[in-house]
């Protein structure tokens, strides 16, 4: 069970400023979540092999094979704007 001191600590770590009505709801939600974990803790896992991942995924990568290289003139013709031999694109990150 989450008590007021633990909620204050979690709120501080998460940089949350909780109103009194939010504190009650947050406490109830966290206790509900912890209740689910308690149910999981009670599951008998004897004989179940530990896994690093729930699904065995393997990356299947192909060999890098050099392909067709476009001539600089073709790239320049396709680019919206060129500057100093490089493609100019719109700014995506604003400077502070």
Swiss-Prot record:
One GO term (biological process): glutaminyl-tRNAGln biosynthesis via transamidation
InterPro entries: Asp/Glu-ADT_sf_sub_c, GatC
Segments crossing the lipid bilayer: none
Source organism superkingdom: Bacteria
Pfam families in alphabetical order: GatC (PF02686)
Catalytic activity: L-glutamyl-tRNA(Gln) + L-glutamine + ATP + H2O = L-glutaminyl-tRNA(Gln) + L-glutamate + ADP + phosphate + H(+); L-aspartyl-tRNA(Asn) + L-glutamine + ATP + H2O = L-asparaginyl-tRNA(Asn) + L-glutamate + ADP + phosphate + 2 H(+)
Record-level Gene Ontology MF annotations: asparaginyl-tRNA synthase (glutamine-hydrolyzing) activity; ATP binding; glutaminyl-tRNA synthase (glutamine-hydrolyzing) activity
EC class: ligase
Key words, A-Z: ATP-binding, Ligase, Nucleotide-binding, Protein biosynthesis
Its EC number(s): 6.3.5.-
Subunit structure and binding partners: Heterotrimer of A, B and C subunits.
Family classification: Belongs to the GatC family.
HAMAP family attached to this UniProt entry: GatC (MF_00122)
Biological role stated in the UniProt entry: Allows the formation of correctly charged Asn-tRNA(Asn) or Gln-tRNA(Gln) through the transamidation of misacylated Asp-tRNA(Asn) or Glu-tRNA(Gln) in organisms which lack either or both of asparaginyl-tRNA or glutaminyl-tRNA synthetases. The reaction takes place in the presence of glutamine and ATP through an activated phospho-Asp-tRNA(Asn) or phospho-Glu-tRNA(Gln).
Name of the protein: Aspartyl/glutamyl-tRNA(Asn/Gln) amidotransferase subunit C
């Amino acid at each position: 069970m989450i008590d007021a001191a633990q909620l204050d600590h979690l709120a501080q770590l998460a940089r949350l400023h909780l109103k009194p009505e939010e504190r009650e709801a947050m406490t109830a939600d966290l206790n509900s979540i912890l209740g689910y974990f308690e149910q999981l803790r009670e599951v008998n896992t004897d004989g179940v092999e530990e896994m690093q991942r729930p699904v065995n995924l393997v990356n299947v990568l192909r060999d890098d094979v050099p392909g067709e290289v476009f001539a600089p003139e073709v790239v320049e013709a396709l680019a919206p704007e060129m500057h100093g031999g490089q493609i100019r694109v719109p700014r995506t990150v604003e400077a502070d």
